Amino acid sequence: MINFSFSKKISFLILIFITFLIPLNLKGMHHERELDKMKIFELYEDWDIAVEASDIDGYVNSLDENVILIPPDGPTITGRDSYRNFLGPVFEVATYKLEQKTPRDIKFYGDFVTVEYNIVVYINFLGNEKSVPSEGALQDSVSDSIYFDLLKRQEDGSWKCLIHTWRQIN
C-alpha cells in the first residue's frame, strides 16, 4: 500500500521547490538580460569611439566574422576582411563625428538581438576631397539616418554585429 501522507509530503515539497525555483530563475534571466544590455552598450560605445577616431581595427573588432553590410546605395559587403577593405578609403578621406538622436532600441531573440537607433553623422572631408570613394559609404556632410543592426552572441558571451544597414532620412 502507498503511504498517502508520504506522497502528500513529497508533493508539497516539490510544490514549494517549484514555487521558489521559478522566481529565482526569472531573477537570473533578468540579471543575465541586464548584463547582456551592458555588453551591447559597451560594444556600441567602443564602435562609436572607433568611428570618431578613424580606427579601422577598433571598428572591425565590433563585427562578427561573417558580417554583412547592406548600404542603401551600394553593393552588399560580406565578411570582416571585405568590410575592412571598404573602411580603408572611408577613413582616409574624412573624419566623422556622431550625434545620437535616439536611444538604441534593443530587442532580444535568443542569441540574436536587433538594435535600431537614429544617429546624425557629421563628415569632415580632408584636404580637397569632396566624396568618399567606397561605393555605398555616406557622402553628405551631414547624414541623419535610422540604423538597424542584427547582433549575434559570440561563443565567449560577447556580442558582435552580424548585419549593419541604415536608411538616410535627410
Spans of model-derived segments:
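N-terminal secretory signal peptides that target proteins for export/translocation
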Residues: 1-7
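Hydrophobic alpha-helical segments, especially transmembrane helices
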Residues: 9-10, 154
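Bacterial N-terminal signal peptides
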Residues: 11-22
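Cleavable N-terminal signal peptides
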Residues: 24-26
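A beta-strand edge to alpha-helix "cap/lid" segment located at domain peripheries
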Residues: 28-43, 49-58, 68-170
